[in-house]
């Protein structure tokens, strides 16, 4: 996966806001009724595919997370990782969510979240980083959900880069989260080697913890929505570049590039064009109150103007 719940199984999750990415491993230093309690099938120390997820509390553990994040989002000289040891310590000490995922005693992923508004209802997941293609992001997200439910919370929110295809698929198709707001240049200029040179547009998603499709998703039973045959292409790909189509139809598809991160390095002009097009089309649709129903790896976002639910 790449990453930050901008991954969740953001698998090559990279980028700030809950995303995930490829990183080097770090060995730990020694030092439907609404659910209000964790599922009995998912213990507090969640395990998935030989991954153990648990809360982190020591400076040695926080140092490992800082190292992991530095590998996922390599900083430029003079800059640090998205969350450093001091903030990790402060978040954990204040009762927020700081957790690590381990495989064979090696830290392979970590997530940081804090309580948000409305108070008593919401957890905001700020950063999630994990190794690529290993199921770590899903294990972290299910653990985070159980942690939130045990504290009486109703939802988890996070942001992600809407142009990163694997993140969109993970967040929408695998977790059942719903985009609710388009946030242009949310973090301002970002100077890590993954996001540098591009506006930091993000989409805010809401994960309603007791939504039937979310409960089915964490059991791996939910089937994502298939694009209907009459869906109109509002944004398509032509020779690697974005082409804006009809955005006025009731049901539209919004495409994304195959690999925006690689495009930023090889063709920054095309990457900037994609950013502008996504802001215009997807951002415009969300601003008008349209609903993102899901995400298809090939077709992109499935968006409806008339869906209510």
Locate the predicted segments by residue:
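Intrinsically disordered, low-complexity, positively biased terminal segments
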Residues: 1-32, 36-46, 151, 164, ...
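Short amphipathic alpha-helix that is part of the acyltransferase structural core
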Residues: 2-16, 20-27, 33, 37-93, ...
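Conserved beta-strand in the GNAT
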Residues: 98-100, 106-115, 122-124
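Short strand-connecting beta-turns/loops that link adjacent beta-strands
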Residues: 104-106, 117-120, 165, 297
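A conserved beta-turn-beta hairpin within the catalytic core of GNAT-like acetyltransferases
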Residues: 115-125, 247-254
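A short, internal acetyl-CoA/4′-phosphopantetheine-binding micro-motif in the GNAT/acyltransferase core
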Residues: 126-134
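Glycine-rich acyl-CoA binding loop
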Residues: 133-144, 148
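Conserved GNAT acetyl-CoA-binding A-motif
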Residues: 148-163
């Amino acid at each position: 996966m790449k990453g930050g719940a901008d991954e969740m199984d953001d698998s090559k999750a990279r980028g700030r806001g809950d995303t995930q990415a490829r990183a080097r491993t770090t060995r730990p230093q020694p030092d439907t009724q609404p659910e209000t309690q964790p599922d009995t099938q998912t213990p507090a120390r969640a395990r998935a595919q030989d991954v153990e997820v648990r809360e982190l509390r020591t400076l040695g553990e926080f140092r490992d997370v800082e190292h992991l994040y530095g590998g996922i989002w390599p900083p430029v000289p003079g800059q640090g990782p998205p969350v450093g040891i001091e903030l990790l310590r402060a978040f954990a000490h204040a009762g927020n969510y700081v957790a690590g995922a381990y495989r064979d005693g090696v830290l392979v992923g970590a997530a940081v979240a804090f309580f948000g508004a409305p108070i008593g209802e919401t957890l905001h997941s700020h950063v999630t980083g994990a190794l690529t293609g290993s199921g770590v992001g899903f294990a972290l997200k299910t653990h985070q959900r159980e942690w939130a439910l045990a504290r009486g919370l109703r939802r988890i929110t996070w942001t992600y880069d809407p142009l990163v295809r694997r993140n969109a698929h993970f967040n929408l198709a695998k977790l059942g989260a719903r985009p609710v707001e388009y946030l242009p240049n949310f973090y301002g200029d970002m100077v890590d080697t993954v996001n540098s040179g591009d506006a930091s547009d993000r989409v805010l998603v809401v994960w309603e913890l007791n939504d039937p499709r979310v409960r089915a998703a964490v059991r791996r039973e939910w089937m994502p929505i298939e694009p209907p045959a009459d869906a109109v292409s509002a944004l398509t790909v032509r020779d690697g570049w974005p082409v804006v189509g009809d955005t006025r139809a009731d049901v539209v598809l919004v495409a994304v590039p195959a690999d925006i991160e690689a495009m930023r390095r090889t063709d920054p002009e095309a990457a900037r064009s994609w950013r502008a097009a996504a802001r215009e089309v997807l951002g415009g649709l969300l601003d008008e109150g349209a609903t993102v129903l899901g995400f298809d790896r090939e077709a992109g976002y499935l968006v409806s103007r008339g869906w209510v639910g």
